[in-house]
Amino acid sequence: MERKYNVAVVGAGHAGCEASLACARMGLKTLIITLNADSMARMPCNPAVGGIAKGQMVREIDAMGGEIGRITDRAVLQFKMLNSSRGPAVWSPRAQCDKELYSVLMSKSVQNQQNLEILQSEATSLTVKNGKVCGVKILTGETIEADAVVITTGTFLKGTIHLGKMHFNGGRFNEVSALYLSKSLIEDCGLKLGRFKTTTTPRINSRSIDYSKMTEQFGDEKPVPFSYSTKVEEWRKNLKQLSCWLTYTNPITHKIVSDNLGLSSIYIGEVNSKSPRYCPSIEEKIERYPEKTSHHVFVEPEGYNTNEVYLNGLYTGLPFNLQQQMINSIVGLENAKVIRYGYAIEYDYSSPLQIKKTLETKTVKNLFLGGQINGTTGYEEAAAQGFVAGVNAGLKVLGKTPFILERNESYIGILVDDITTKGMDEPYRMFTSRAEYRLSIRNDNADLRLMDAGHSIGLISDKAYKKFELYRKAFTDICENNAENLPDDEDLSPWSIEKAKEEVYIHKKYEGYIEIQNKMINKMKKSKDRKIPEDFDYNKLKSLSAETKQRLFEVRPQTIGQASRICAIKPSDIAILTVYLEKQKKERKQKKHNKIK
């Protein structure tokens, strides 16, 4: 049987699901190829969606017609707005999820989507003719013809699992890895691949935990859903939130770990690749911060119908017997029983300097990459790239203008710009500090910023868009003190007048600050040619992180512009450096003036 599609998506994780749904909803005949049709959109690490800057990206995907926000709202166990004690610009929604329910709901969404088919198989190579991809070869030897291909392989690309000194092939524990595709990406597509690693935590039985010794962490009293389409009051009524719990490691825990570093797969030479700096294993934390006597361990439920509990903060590559000892040394976990052991996983990734801002490869036309294959880490970063790659694959097939989000429009735009411009030498994670426009690209205004784009692509229906236009007009009228003939909530639903008023309050609060922000950004752009002294001591800049100082000392940039292009250097770092150099210049000028006097 001949199989021919407009778009073929390889991989059915968070990136692959968003990519395939976007293409199918754009009216394109789409195929998603997965190693296991029963494990789509799994949460193999933390069973949560959102967080600092990540929650903003989920809202952005939702505002443009993506799926992750809607599914999260239906699978949520607990909701918290992070940074709520600070200004709204950095408020970040986060939801603890029922991991099985999330996977089931996303899988159902993919299965029920018109124009979208699923095939369980392994993609072994790509067919490339005259510099353009035209198909995917699968394990059976069959070739799937496709006008465009999106690769979203996650940790499965030559994935290797390490547990102490044990190591074996796998994309996740008990799941096979994709062994053949890497060779084709190198030989047929001319891509350079590297290796990254990450670790996950042990899961324990909730019945073996003494919660009375821990601090209970409640969800928000008035949770706010991720998706604009979720009706807030109805959702809150039906939401049964579960608590998370907080405990800590201690000197005994640290001694068990430090005495056995040589047995961890992270240190015995089995895993030589870089891991996420901001999601370190417990081994790395204890080695990196020997002065600390404790580290947080968040004890998080994994679902309504399971006793499995996730130990957030105990990512590890230690042998299983030492994992048990380590866990039992922690207060409240003295009698804890392990259900699944933590492990390290290594996988292939492609340097994102080899892709355009559309996420199309520079070496092969109509081939797009999304998610961890681009060197990022996190479900949200993956979903965002999957969405962008899927949309652009669809637009390329349709012969339409590419879809590119800019840094001043969205966190997704910042993510794509960062990875395609600066590249990386360790897994990339999104933070609010990476966003110079964070005062204007908040989580609360994602719909106002991006729903026009979603509608123009064809992922927001005309019906939903008409409601949105009514809401936007209400927002504008309230802003301009013209609130006499506002529509009823019934006409605005799922938006409301209350939501519009809240948005106006935040908008007015930040109006002046946004002007200052934009002036500062323009000043930074103008100062890109400013020289940095060769012997400049970055330790003088107390506001810079240790990572930033390390990068600047390593590269020794000659100008502000060069410094801004260094991997992992954030706009906030450049602002600090620019202000300091400006201050130094003024001081020198003043000294010179005083001498003349």
Swiss-Prot record:
NAD(+) binds at residues 275-289. Pfam families: GIDA (PF01134), SAM_GIDA_C (PF13932). NAD-binding protein involved in the addition of a carboxymethylaminomethyl (cmnm) group at the wobble position (U34) of certain tRNAs, forming tRNA-cmnm(5)s(2)U34. This is tRNA uridine 5-carboxymethylaminomethyl modification enzyme MnmG. Homodimer. Heterotetramer of two MnmE and two MnmG subunits. It is found in: Cytoplasm. GO terms for biological process: tRNA methylation; tRNA wobble uridine modification. One of its GO terms (molecular function) is flavin adenine dinucleotide binding. FAD binds at G11, A12, G13, H14, A15, G16. Keywords: Cytoplasm, FAD, Flavoprotein, NAD, tRNA processing. Its main location: cytoplasm. Belongs to the MnmG family. One of its GO terms (cellular component) is cytosol. SMART domains: GIDA_assoc_3. Coiled coil: none annotated. It comes from the Bacteria. Its cofactor is FAD. InterPro entries: FAD/NAD-bd_sf, MnmG, MnmG-rel, MnmG-rel_CS, MnmG_C, MnmG_C_subdom, MnmG_C_subdom_sf, MnmG_N.
